[in-house]
């Protein structure tokens, strides 16, 4: 009967993981995140496409998506003596649901935010928070998003390996954790190749923050700079190929056009 309950937990967590907030948010804006940038419906692509505010909102929801099923599993299965294995069953399942959603033809995101949510339950929450803040700060400083995200996964995995109780279905937890960590690395294989080739796409959080909160140049000044220098790179995020698609010459009211420039 306990195995049956764990199977039900796995199925429910997987289906819960099918919810992709990046797609929901972009559709609410009458757009499709999968048609922008890397095409990945995740936080980094949301940052490049819709800006800092929407990226943080999306990341928060995705982390909560990882927290909810794992926390419920921990509490519900505690009296059965299965809280540890239940956390890993729920965590792996929700991440699988995010990466391979059945309702989106098994084409989803890369699972890092959901893994972060799972880590908030598998580890003491303050430990996961410290790791998250450190990795986020690293991305802000370096603008290399993939190192920050993969760094979080590897650091969290290492600490979890130390904390898992071997006497409480520990070998199953080790297998589950090793599997999901390897899977996340695999779906990031393109990012890893670009990192070694020095061609990884930048993740300029500072520029996105300044743009959202209007701490840098005004839109009018950016438009004027684009008019005078069609090949200029603004705030480190707008590239030449994007500028070619924006017909601003001779148009006085251009703020709307600048909003539609996709940040890569």
Q: What are the functions of these language-model segments?
A:
Residues 1-8, 70-89, 120-127, 161-176:
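Helix-coil boundary and interhelical linker segments in multi-pass alpha-helical membrane proteins
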Residues 9, 13-14, 18, 22, ...:
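Alpha-helical transmembrane segments in multi-pass membrane proteins
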Residues 22-25, 95-107, 134-142, 189-193:
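C-terminal ends of transmembrane helices
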Residues 23-55, 108, 193-216:
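Cytosolic, membrane-interface loops and tails of multi-pass inner-membrane proteins
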Residues 32-43, 102-116, 144-155:
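Short, non-helical or kinked segments that cap or interrupt transmembrane helices
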Residues 47-50, 73-76, 93, 111-142, ...:
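Interfacial segments of multi-pass membrane proteins
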Residues 127-131, 145-152, 168-180:
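Loop-to-transmembrane alpha-helix initiation sites
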Residues 213-264:
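Long, low-complexity, intrinsically disordered cytosolic termini of multi-pass membrane proteins
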């Amino acid at each position: 009967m306990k195995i049956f309950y764990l199977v039900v937990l796995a199925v429910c967590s997987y289906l819960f993981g099918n919810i992709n907030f990046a797609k929901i948010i972009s559709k609410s804006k009458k757009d499709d995140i999968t048609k922008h940038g890397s095409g990945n419906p995740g936080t980094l692509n949301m940052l490049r496409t819709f800006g800092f505010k929407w990226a943080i909102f999306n990341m928060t929801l995705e982390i909560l998506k990882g927290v909810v099923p794992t926390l419920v599993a921990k509490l519900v299965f505690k009296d059965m003596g299965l809280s540890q294995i239940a956390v890993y069953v729920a965590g792996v399942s929700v991440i699988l649901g995010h990466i391979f959603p059945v309702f989106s033809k098994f084409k989803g995101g890369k699972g890092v935010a959901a893994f972060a949510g799972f880590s908030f339950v598998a580890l003491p929450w303050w430990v996961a928070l410290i790791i998250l803040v450190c990795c986020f700060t690293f991305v802000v400083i370096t603008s290399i998003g993939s190192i920050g995200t993969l760094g979080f996964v590897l650091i969290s995995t290492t600490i979890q390996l130390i904390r898992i109780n071997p006497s409480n279905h520990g070998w199953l937890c080790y297998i589950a954790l090793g599997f999901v960590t390897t899977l996340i690395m695999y779906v990031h294989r393109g990012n890893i190749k670009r990192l070694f080739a020095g061609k990884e796409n930048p993740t300029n959080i500072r520029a996105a923050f300044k743009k959202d909160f209007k701490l840098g140049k005004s839109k009018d000044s950016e438009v004027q700079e684009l008019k005078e220098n069609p090949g200029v790179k603004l705030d480190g995020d707008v590239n030449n190929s994007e500028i070619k698609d924006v017909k601003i010459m001779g148009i006085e009211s251009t703020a709307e056009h600048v909003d539609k420039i996709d940040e890569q």
